[in-house]
């Protein structure tokens, strides 16, 4: 036995082409195998994300830029987004208090810190599929059909900030109908997500903030009127999209689940209110602010509480 071991050691230590080839393979393959093992053994932690959605011209990109830079001046000029643009931001807490976004942006901000991605999505009608695809991705994860992450590394969606121009939401203005139609699609997708889970455990809630922007303008509506106007328009959209369903003479109890799933909010209700979305574990808040004047602290607090 000892003789065989001695011969093996002598062969290994004797320079030869075979020894050089084996040694080279070991040097090349071992680091690769170790890297693959460590990569598979260590789960990749994607940052939680907040989506910025809403009609074009509402101020989504300006809001994202303001929160990213944390400046005290006027909001910088921006251009219409063509693709989703994520930026990494930090929520800082000093004890139980959430620091304002200007302080959170500092490298030396006190307290604990948590990073997240704020994803600006295009508001143009032909490009809204980017936002809806991300919401659909959240639905797929809730139902267990998908384990993929977005291409930019964004993790689970924790909230949706729907930015609207508060000066373009008069009852007779076309801007109200356009904003409400987009919001209807967003809320409908989230409502369907609530029932998409395969298990008895409900998916994590995704709440919505309607950020009524441009309150610095004289013609801007206060948050309370933005809320009531949107609720009324959403009710009209719901009625038109479900036309004939309630007038068919069929009782509510006789309506199939598929038809009820296509009804936003409380089924059969005459008026729509955001409060009806609580049935699906969706809170909808309407808060006013102004990106131009930097008055976005209430929006920042809302975002920070979801991270």
Where does each model-flagged region fall?
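Short acidic, S/G/P-rich loop/turn micro-motifs used as interaction or catalytic elements
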Residues: 59, 124-126, 166-171, 216-218, ...
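Core residues of folded domains in eukaryotic genome-function proteins
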Residues: 46-49, 83-87, 112-117, 156-160, ...
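Switch II (G3) loop of P-loop NTPases
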Residues: 110-137
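Amphipathic alpha-helical interface elements that mediate macromolecular binding in regulatory proteins
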Residues: 27-28, 61-65, 116, 129, ...
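Conserved C-terminal guanine-recognition region of P-loop GTPase G domains, centered on the G4
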Residues: 135-278
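Conserved GTPase G-domain signal focused on the G5
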Residues: 59-60, 290-307
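Conserved G1/Walker A P-loop phosphate-binding module
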Residues: 2-116
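Structural signal for hydrophobic/aromatic residues that build the beta-strand cores
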Residues: 50-53, 63, 118-120, 160-163, ...
């Amino acid at each position: 036995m000892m003789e065989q071991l001695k011969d093996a050691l002598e062969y290994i230590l004797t320079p030869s082409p075979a020894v050089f080839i084996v040694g080279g393979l070991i040097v090349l393959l071992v680091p690769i195998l170790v890297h693959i093992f460590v990569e598979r053994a260590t789960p990749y932690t994607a940052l939680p994300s907040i989506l910025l959605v809403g009609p074009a011209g509402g101020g989504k990109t300006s809001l994202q830029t303001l929160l990213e830079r944390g400046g005290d001046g006027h909001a910088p000029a921006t251009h219409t987004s063509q693709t989703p643009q994520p930026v990494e931001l930090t929520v800082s807490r000093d004890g139980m208090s959430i620091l304002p976004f200007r302080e959170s942006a500092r490298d030396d901000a006190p307290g604990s810190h948590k990073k997240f991605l704020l994803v600006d999505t295009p508001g143009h009608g032909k490009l809204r599929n980017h936002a809806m695809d991300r919401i659909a991705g959240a639905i797929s994860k809730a139902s267990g059909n998908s384990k993929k992450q977005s291409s930019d590394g964004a993790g689970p969606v924790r909230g949706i900030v729907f930015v609207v121009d508060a000066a373009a939401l008069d009852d007779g203005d076309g801007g109200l109908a356009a904003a409400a139609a987009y919001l209807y699609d967003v809320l409908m997708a989230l409502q369907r997500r609530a029932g998409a889970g395969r298990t008895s455990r409900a998916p994590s809630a995704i709440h919505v903030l309607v950020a009524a922007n441009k309150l610095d303008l004289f013609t801007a509506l206060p948050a309370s009127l933005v809320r009531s106007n949107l609720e009324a328009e959403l009710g009209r959209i719901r009625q038109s999209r479900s036309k004939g369903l309630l007038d068919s003479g069929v009782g509510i109890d006789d309506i199939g689940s598929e038809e009820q799933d296509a009804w936003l909010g409380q089924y059969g209700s005459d008026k729509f209110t955001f409060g009806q979305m609580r049935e699906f574990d969706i809170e909808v808040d309407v808060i006013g602010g102004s990106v131009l004047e930097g008055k976005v602290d209430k929006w920042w607090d809302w975002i920070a509480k979801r991270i």
